[in-house]
């Protein structure tokens, strides 16, 4: 027998078989992964046996003659099939099915292939992870609320702010407060005489305050972690014997977390402990000043803890600085019943770990206002008076300050005379003989801490009650401090409401609301356009000006329909695009924003404006093509827009062409995603107004305004980690080239804890210390004594040499080094934010302003711009400054949009139409009627002044308004801004400027001279002058108009391809 056949065959046996038969041609079709097939061919020179196969070795045993016809094999794994016939087939580009002549592929299969199989588009849209809004009902919490006072010190990096006083207040669960209080006493903290749970540290030594606070925080989290570990051991006494038998360990603290995961039958009820470090506006100041002393997680905690850290700086502030000490949770399992999640609750099985979390939270990020205003908004008592911090600063810098005979600081240290007299009167009422500057500073700081602690408790209880009562989530156990900002909390509430309504029965929000990712993330972000802000009049205007403002513009826009459902696959998308193109080519008919035959989507377009006499000063769209955002009436090329913008442009007379782009996204339908969320907040606000509940009103207003911003959150590929936090997974990514270390920087060593060793003295011979001559480039001086060497007196034969002190820092290099890691893949991975919702929110706001422009300018169509009357002079994102003529048109043409005449705020799906309303912002302070400014001056965007407000109803005059972004407004007046404009207009060489103190915050930076974890004080001087680099065109000496095809944007140098018919 020459060859034996079996059921399975590997490649070597197949090749051996072919070599025996020696056909004229042998084809081997091999099935690979993902449906691919490779072909290999063996050709023989002579079928009668005179030649050898191309890939065959010489063999003595051969058949007398070869086979004179080709033979084909199909290899699938170890199965080999003989192919009788091969026929060419085609592959459907939409569903990947193979067919001979024709086939029918279902929509479901096309969608599945587009979203899950196609290697190019399968990662374009990702499901959004969901976890209920609530916290575990048994969570134990401890709050350390603190404030710090600083003085100015001239350091190596400029005027740095050095803490000299820190006051902290303990609150939370009684057992944790008792534990923390005992530790504070043990570590020698001073107890404030007026409150037993308030402690302070007071010393001018440069690093002492930070070191003492660091020691306390470290000892506290160490003791809490140890307590959690001891509870874990009490519930699992068998671990000691197991550790000794399996790992040979006597002390369980020597186990690692990975060892502990392998332990048998871990049991016991899990514990969840949270330690919050809280202050007001600390993330942009106090936590940076103290950060180098307190950021430490290499503690004396038991080894089995899994320690992770979330450190995220953003815009010069610490957004996250959280440390988690985790142990396994024996009750954790995959959830199958999601009813509790729908009501915002969670329990033991939802947490992979039991933990101690140490979190830094800033109440400013939850209130967006000063401490005093926040206290008023949440109905908290606030003590009168304030502290003369300028005097305190001078006292610590110079050792004294200017005072009267009783030691009370002079008027120069106070904001104004009124503040000086008030505080002097308050002090005299105390009956003290001499003014104690530091004692008063301590009292004011402690009172601020008590107010902040009251604010913390008020925020906790008020938000929990709001989520329970207004949102209807009675199982949530909501904790507002679980998330760091009001934006993240608003987004969590929105997602919870959506999850409750949709009931997806899974751990994400379902397939109908997805997050754009990779190529689609950048494409969707390109459709997000900023707000409108520019004057169309520069100079002094001596005629009435009224300011109208859209009421809750983003909230109203959020109630409108948003895209819903997974994006259409290319086949259905092409059909939907065709419907849009047909509608857009009907130039004589306007398109309804809510036409059910037209699907929502994001497109790439070219657009050409109508005749310039049909345009106005409020263009429907803006472009970044020139490098700066400009609202323009020029032709648009290659712009990414939403379907709402298509309707707005078309209805304003623009000619649009949809460009072929594989990233074009069409959604199957519309849905009012955020309408319920906005309605809840509006209802809560109205109820608060009726009940005069200032706290509820503040919460509802903040949550209503914050949601849009969360949709527009911009992600990047960067991650900042401390060197000691470089986990093995990160190291592998760096080694593989998927992550790059973009920059590394070190914390300023002066802010770290240090120990200075006593100086050493040794006697050396002068000859031993002689400086050896060296090359010029190696020495800064030609000749001189040795380093650290002072020449001895002439009659002395030896020299006493004193070393410079040796400094030992209480930190390792990993604690001091910050790495900024950046992915080598420029594409963003997004599974958190449905960014396209932000695109449509902004598109709806552009539709609002487009309708507004119709009220004002529709009657001017066909009249050249230079011949039209002045109706509006300034446009902000949600407001418009109109003249008397513009106001009359608002009262007539736009009456249904004025709130006092019944204008609506919330979109009604049963009667779909644009829904927005305005109200006059310039109102009389005496009678509340609409008022106007008789004279105004406009210098630039966000730089204008209204002289005063006159009321036509009661005839009274009230204070005007000044807007000067970036300037110290207290130094500005209407007369000064008027002089500035007139000086520029008349060619004078006078320069105007304002100055204010500014804090430069550095957390992690690769810039030279910018050192991590420093706050330096600088004087910021800004020039006050009319608009120079305008993004509009002058129509005359005062009036401006947007760019147009006759007067294009000179910055736009982009080359585009245009085919002329």
UniProtKB/Swiss-Prot annotation:
Pfam families found in the cross-reference section: DNA_pol_B_2
EC number, as in UniProt: 2.7.7.7
Region (Disordered): 773-792
Reaction(s) catalysed by this chain's protein: DNA(n) + a 2'-deoxyribonucleoside 5'-triphosphate = DNA(n+1) + diphosphate
Principal EC category: transferase
Entry keyword annotation includes Cell cycle: no
Disulfide bond entries: none
Principal location listed in the UniProt entry: host cell
Keyword terms of this UniProt record: DNA replication, DNA-binding, DNA-directed DNA polymerase, Host nucleus, Nucleotidyltransferase, Transferase, Viral DNA replication
Record-level GO cellular component terms: host cell nucleus
Compartment(s) of residence: Host nucleus
InterPro entries: DNA-dir_DNA_pol_B (IPR006172), DNA-dir_DNA_pol_B_adenovir (IPR014382), DNA-dir_DNA_pol_B_CS (IPR017964), DNA-dir_DNA_pol_B_mt/vir (IPR004868), DNA/RNA_pol_sf (IPR043502), DNA_pol_palm_dom_sf (IPR023211), RNaseH-like_sf (IPR012337)
An MF annotation (GO) of this entry: DNA binding
PROSITE patterns the UniProt entry points to: DNA_POLYMERASE_B
GO biological process, one term: viral DNA genome replication
Subunit (UniProt): Heterodimer with the terminal protein; this heterodimer binds to bp 9 to 18 of the genome. Forms a complex with viral pTP, DBP and hosts NFIA and POU2F1/OCT1 for initiation of replication.
Role description: Eukaryotic-type DNA polymerase involved in viral genomic replication. DNA synthesis is protein primed, and acts in a strand displacement replication. Assembles in complex with viral pTP, DBP, host NFIA and host POU2F1/OCT1 on viral origin of replication. The polymerase covalently transfers dCMP onto pTP, thereby initiating complementary strand synthesis.
HAMAP family in the cross-refs: ADV_DPOL (MF_04055)
Further comment: This DNA polymerase requires a protein as a primer.
Protein family membership: Belongs to the DNA polymerase type-B family.
Name under which the protein is recorded: DNA polymerase
């Amino acid at each position: 027998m020459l060859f034996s056949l079996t059921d399975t065959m590997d490649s070597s046996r197949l090749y051996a078989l072919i070599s025996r038969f020696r056909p004229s041609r042998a084809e081997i079709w091999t099935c690979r992964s993902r449906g691919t097939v490779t072909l290999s061919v063996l050709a023989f020179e002579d079928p009668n046996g005179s030649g050898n196969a191309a890939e065959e070795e010489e063999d003595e045993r051969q058949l007398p003659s070869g086979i004179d016809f080709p033979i084909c094999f199909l290899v699938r794994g170890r199965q080999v099939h003989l192919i009788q016939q091969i026929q060419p087939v085609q592959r459907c580009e939409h569903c990947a099915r193979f067919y001979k002549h024709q086939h029918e592929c279902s929509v479901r299969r096309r969608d599945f292939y587009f979203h899950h199989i196609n290697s190019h588009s399968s990662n374009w849209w990702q499901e959004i992870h969901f976890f209920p809004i609530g916290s575990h009902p048994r969570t134990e919490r401890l709050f350390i609320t603190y404030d710090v006072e600083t003085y100015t010190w001239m350091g190596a990096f400029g005027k740095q702010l050095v803490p000299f006083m820190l006051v902290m207040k303990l609150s939370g669960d009684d057992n944790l407060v008792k534990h923390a209080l005992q530790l504070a006493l043990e570590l020698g903290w001073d107890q404030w005489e007026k409150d037993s749970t308030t402690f302070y540290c007071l010393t001018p030594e440069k690093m002492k305050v930070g070191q003492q606070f660091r020691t306390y925080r470290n000892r506290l989290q160490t003791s809490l972690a140890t307590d959690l570990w001891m509870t874990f051991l009490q519930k699992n006494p068998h671990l000691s014997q197991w550790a000794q038998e399996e790992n040979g360990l006597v002390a369980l603290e020597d186990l690692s977390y990975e060892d502990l995961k392998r332990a048998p039958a871990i049991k016991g009820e899990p514990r969840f402990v949270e330690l919050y470090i809280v202050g007001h506006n600390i993330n942009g100041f106090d936590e940076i000043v103290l950060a180098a002393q307190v950021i430490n997680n290499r503690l004396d905690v038991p080894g089995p803890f899994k320690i992770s850290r979330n450190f995220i700086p953003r815009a010069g502030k610490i957004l996250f600085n959280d440390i988690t000490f985790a142990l396994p949770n024996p009750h954790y399992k995959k959830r199958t019943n999601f009813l509790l999640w729908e009501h915002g609750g969670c329990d033991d099985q939802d947490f992979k770990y039991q933990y101690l979390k140490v979190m830094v939270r800033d109440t400013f990020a939850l209130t967006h206002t000063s401490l005093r205003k926040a206290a008023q908004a949440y109905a908290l008592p606030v003590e009168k008076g304030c502290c003369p911090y300028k005097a305190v600063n001078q006292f610590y810098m110079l050792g004294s300050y200017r005072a009267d005979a009783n030691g009370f600081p002079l008027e120069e240290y106070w904001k104004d005379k009124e503040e000086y007299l008030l505080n002097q009167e308050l002090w005299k009422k105390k009956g003290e003989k001499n003014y104690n500057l530091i004692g008063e500073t301590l009292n004011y700081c402690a009172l601020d801490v008590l107010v902040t602690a009251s604010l913390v408790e008020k925020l906790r209880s008020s938000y929990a009650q709001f989520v329970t009562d207004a949102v209807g989530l009675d199982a949530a156990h909501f904790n507002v401090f679980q998330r760091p900002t009001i934006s993240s909390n608003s987004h969590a509430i929105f997602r919870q409401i959506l999850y409750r309504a949709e009931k997806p029965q899974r751990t994400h929000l379902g397939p109908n609301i997805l997050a754009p990712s990779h190529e689609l993330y950048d494409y969707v972000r390109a459709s997000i356009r900023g707000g409108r802000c520019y004057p169309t009049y520069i100079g002094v205007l001596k005629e009435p000006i009224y300011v109208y403002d859209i009421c809750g513009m983003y909230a109203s826009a959020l109630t409108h329909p948003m895209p819903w459902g997974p994006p259409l696959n290319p086949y259905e998308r092409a059909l939907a695009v065709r419907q849009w193109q047909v509608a857009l080519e009907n130039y004589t008919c306007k398109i309804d924003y809510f036409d059910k035959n037209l699907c929502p989507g994001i497109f790439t377009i070219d657009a050409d404006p109508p005749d310039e006499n049909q345009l106005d000063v409020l263009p429907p769209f803006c472009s970044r093509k020139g490098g700066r955002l400009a609202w323009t009436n020029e032709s648009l090329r290659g712009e990414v827009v939403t379907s709402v913008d298509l309707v707005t442009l078309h209805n304003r007379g623009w000619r649009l062409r949809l460009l072929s782009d594989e990233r074009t996204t069409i959604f199957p339908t519309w849905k009012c995603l955020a309408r319920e969320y906005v309605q809840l907040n509006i209802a809560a606000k109205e109820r608060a107004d009726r009940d005069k509940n200032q706290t509820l009103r503040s919460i509802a207003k903040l949550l209503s305004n914050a949601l849009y911003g969360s949709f527009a959150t911009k992600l990047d590929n960067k991650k900042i980690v401390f060197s000691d936090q470089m986990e093995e997974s990160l190291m592998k990514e760096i080694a593989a080239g998927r992550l790059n270390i973009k920059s590394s920087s070190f914390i300023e060593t002066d802010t770290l804890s240090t120990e200075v060793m006593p100086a050493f003295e040794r006697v050396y011979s002068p000859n031993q210390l002689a400086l050896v001559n060296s090359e010029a480039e190696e020495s800064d001086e030609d000749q001189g004594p040795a380093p650290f060497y002072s020449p001895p007196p002439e009659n002395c034969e030896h020299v006493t040499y004193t070393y410079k002190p040796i400094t030992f820092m209480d930190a390792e290099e990993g604690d001091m080094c910050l790495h900024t890691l950046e992915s080598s893949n420029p594409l963003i991975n997004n599974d958190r934010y449905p960014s396209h919702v932000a695109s449509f929110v902004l598109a709806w706001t552009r539709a609002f302003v487009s309708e507004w422009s119709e009220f004002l300018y529709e009657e001017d169509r066909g009249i050249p711009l230079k011949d039209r009357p002045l109706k509006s002079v300034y446009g902000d994102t949600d407001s418009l400054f109109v003249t008397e003529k513009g106001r009359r048109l608002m009262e007539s043409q736009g009456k249904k949009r004025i709130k006092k005449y019944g204008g609506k705020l919330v979109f009604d799906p049963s009667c779909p139409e644009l829904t927005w309303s305005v109200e006059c912002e310039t109102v009389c302070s005496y009678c509340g009627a609409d008022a106007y400014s008789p004279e105004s001056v406009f210098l630039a965007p966000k730089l204008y002044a209204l002289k005063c407000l006159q009321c036509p109803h009661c005839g009274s005059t009230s204070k005007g308004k000044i807007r000067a972004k970036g300037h110290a407004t207290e130094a500005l007046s209407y007369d000064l801004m008027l002089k500035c404009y007139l000086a520029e207009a008349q060619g004078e060489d006078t320069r105007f400027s304002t100055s204010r103190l500014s804090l430069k915050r550095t957390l992690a930076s690769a810039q030279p001279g910018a050192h991590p974890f420093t706050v330096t004080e600088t004087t910021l001087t800004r020039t006050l002058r009319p608009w120079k680099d305008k993004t509009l065109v002058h129509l005359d000496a005062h009036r401006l108009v947007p760019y147009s095809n006759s007067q294009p944007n000179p910055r736009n140098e982009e080359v585009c391809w245009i085919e002329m018919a």
